[in-house]
Regions:
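A cross-family structural signal marking well-folded subdomains
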Residues: 80-182
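Basic- and aromatic-enriched surface patches that contact anionic nucleotides/nucleic acids
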Residues: 1-103, 107, 115, 165
Length: 182
């Protein structure tokens, strides 16, 4: 079962991190993608909060297409360009590959930034200049724009369907074969 926790968009990264720590009091290690998602959720200036919803909703719909009626009740999200771009998942019954938010963030990040460490994405979304070790607003803006483009490529119906066809063409018949944690 996928749990969805809705956080107020006005929370800053420290407050979001504190919430994660409290929820995670049983000691489960947080992944870098958890930190990326919390960073995005806290950012309303550059649309990170909306991108976080795209990631959440896409991954949720990929597993459970009947979640769509609930998603469209989010009127803020419904007004964005992304709502129509992921609507196709409401009718998708393919279950050989159901990406989670780690998959989606990693692919979008590698595609747009030619980097693989999600900890670098957290730094870039914070505006870190890796050469000068300073934090710059233009890096934040550029990073959110690049991430947005990577997410758009990931959620594109044609691209996603082609990827699923490639998986099937490679001989995979079950999602269990794709998971390294069989």
């Amino acid at each position: 079962q996928i749990g969805v926790i809705e956080l107020d968009h006005s929370l800053d990264i420290d407050e979001v991190t504190e919430i994660f720590i409290r929820i995670n009091s049983k000691g489960t290690a947080l992944s870098q993608s958890d930190f990326v998602m919390s960073k995005m959720a806290a950012d309303t200036v550059h649309g990170g909060n909306i991108l976080r919803k795209v990631v959440d909703y896409f991954c949720h719909l990929a597993v459970k297409p009947d979640f769509y009626p609930q998603m469209i009740k989010d009127l803020e999200f419904e007004k964005t360009e992304f709502a129509s771009k992921i609507k196709w998942l409401a009718k998708d019954n393919e279950d050989i590959y159901n990406p989670d938010y780690n998959d989606m963030l990693r692919v979008a990040f590698m595609y747009s930034f030619n980097r693989a460490k999600l900890s670098d994405l957290v730094s870039l979304l914070s505006g870190r200049d890796f050469e000068t070790r300073e934090f710059k607003e233009e890096i934040v803006e550029d990073s959110y724009n690049k991430l947005c483009e990577g997410i758009k490529v990931f959620i594109n119906e044609h691209n996603f369907e082609q990827f699923v066809l490639a998986i099937k063409g490679a001989g995979f018949k079950s999602s269990k074969q794709l998971n390294s944690q069989m």
